[in-house]
From Swiss-Prot:
Keywords: Glycoprotein, Hydrolase, Lipid degradation, Lipid metabolism, Signal. It comes from Drosophila melanogaster (Fruit fly). Coiled coil: none annotated. It comes from the Eukaryota. Fat body. This is Lipase 3. The gene is Lip3. Glycans are attached at residue 131. GO terms for biological process: lipid catabolic process. InterPro entries: AB_hydrolase_fold (IPR029058), AB_hydrolase_lipase (IPR006693), Lipase_euk (IPR025483). The keyword Glycoprotein applies. Belongs to the AB hydrolase superfamily. Lipase family. PANTHER family: LYSOSOMAL ACID LIPASE-RELATED.
Length: 394
């Protein structure tokens, strides 16, 4: 048997053990319960009929149930889900930290991801289901979830925390639906993704010049599912990305290639848990919209082509988002080694926000984009500061 064949055999045997035996928990709700916290699932229907699932940690077992708890609403990035906020476990994950601090924690899921692949009328195999970008997530999903949370809890406002695309959709919401500013106590944007003209991610830089140019082919391909999750891919990723696997470094480099190289903040024991939950799926158009942002250097709506734009917007070019409408307090947290959200782009955003409350460059030189959710010292360098700032608004 050749060495290559032997490696394949070992991999398939290991995969069989994963399929037959124990594996990291892939479901967010089950993971929360396994960690000893109370969990609720809630369904929300948007005004354009997408059915979304939220996960809730109503209180911490350390503090017990109480009434009138302030609300923290957490929103994930692209290809991610609510699982990101609990993946590192108690004491280390932001959702658990906030619950321990007395918050009623709600975690959203955008249309098209693992937990929100449903529509009142359209099955997911219809192309029209996937005809959205992060613009629609900001215009419809986040407002619908916030309205539901406020109605359910009786609170008047939420503390918003977003990572990556979770920051983008917040800015879309408050720019284009400014009435939602009144429902936000403060917005904590981790790795804020708005202006992206100086992005260093080699993947985006390689493909954006082609995929970020509107044309008929891109328009057709945009309304498709992008990197969906399924059990086979999860099991294969879990086996290949175990800390003891010969492929562990390859898995780590995949993460570094997206958000920036930082071995000091990556726990190799977490890799198989990441693969159990990510990627969580999205629409191709979400990725194309970010490619357009890189090409244009602007923070603006989706570019459908010069033929369709006049019908959609009344102009040949898509309009910029109205950041002047973002009146709720915004706190920016960003890293010097973030390949997705360059320091210069974040500071351009900072200078355009009318109510900037915090400019926080993470005091760790190699801090990268995905360290905000998976970094071993995320609590020390980011979450403690987020919690302190949130409490100042209570």
């Amino acid at each position: 048997m050749t060495r290559g064949a032997l490696k394949v055999t070992i991999l398939l045997v290991g995969l069989g053990l994963v399929l037959a035996g124990s594996r990291p928990i892939s479901d967010c709700g089950e993971r929360i319960e396994d960690d000893g916290y109370p969990m609720e699932r809630h369904e929300v229907v948007t005004s354009d009929n997408y059915i979304l699932t939220m996960h809730r940690i109503p209180y911490s077992p350390k503090t017990g149930e109480s009434s009138n708890r302030p609300v923290a609403f957490l929103m994930h990035g692209m290809l991610s889900s609510s699982s990101d906020w609990v993946l590192m476990g108690p004491e280390r994950s932001l959702a658990y930290m906030l619950a321990d601090a007395g918050y009623d924690v709600w975690m959203g899921n955008a249309r098209g991801n693992t937990y929100s692949k449903a529509h009142k009328y359209w099955p997911t195999y219809w192309q029209i289901f996937w005809n959205f970008s992060w613009n629609e997530i900001g215009m419809y999903d986040v407002p619908a979830m916030i309205d539901y949370v406020l109605a359910k809890t009786g609170q008047q406002q939420v503390q918003y925390v977003g990572h990556s695309q979770g920051t983008t959709v917040y800015l879309v919401m408050v720019s284009e639906r400014p009435e939602y500013n009144d429902k936000i106590k403060s917005a904590h944007l981790l790795g804020p993704a708005a202006y992206m003209g100086n992005m260093k991610s080699p993947l985006t830089r390689a493909f954006a010049p082609i995929l970020g140019q509107p044309n008929a082919i891109v328009e057709v391909c945009g309304s498709m599912e992008f990197m969906p999750s399924n059990k086979f891919k999860q099991d294969l990723g879990i086996e290949m990305c175990q800390a003891t696997s010969p492929y562990a470094d390859m898995c780590a480099n995949e993460i570094f290639l997206i958000g920036g190289y930082d071995t000091e903040q990556l726990d190799y024991e977490l890799l198989e848990h990441i693969k159990a939950t990510s990627p969580a799926g999205a629409s191709v158009n979400q990725n194309l919209h970010f490619c357009q942002e890189y090409n244009s250097g602007k923070f603006r709506k989706f570019d459908y082509t010069a033929l369709r734009n006049p019908y959609e917007y009344g102009s040949y070019f898509p309009p910029d988002y109205k950041l002047k409408n973002a009146k709720a307090p915004v706190l920016l947290y960003y890293g010097a080694n973030d390949w997705m959200c360059d320091v210069s782009d974040v500071r351009k955003l900072r200078d355009e926000l009318p109510n900037m409350a915090l400019d926080y460059l993470v005091p760790f030189e190699k801090w990268a984009h995905l360290d905000f959710i998976w970094g071993t010292e995320a609590r020390k360098y980011v979450y403690d500061e987020v919690l302190k700032q949130m409490q100042s608004y209570e």
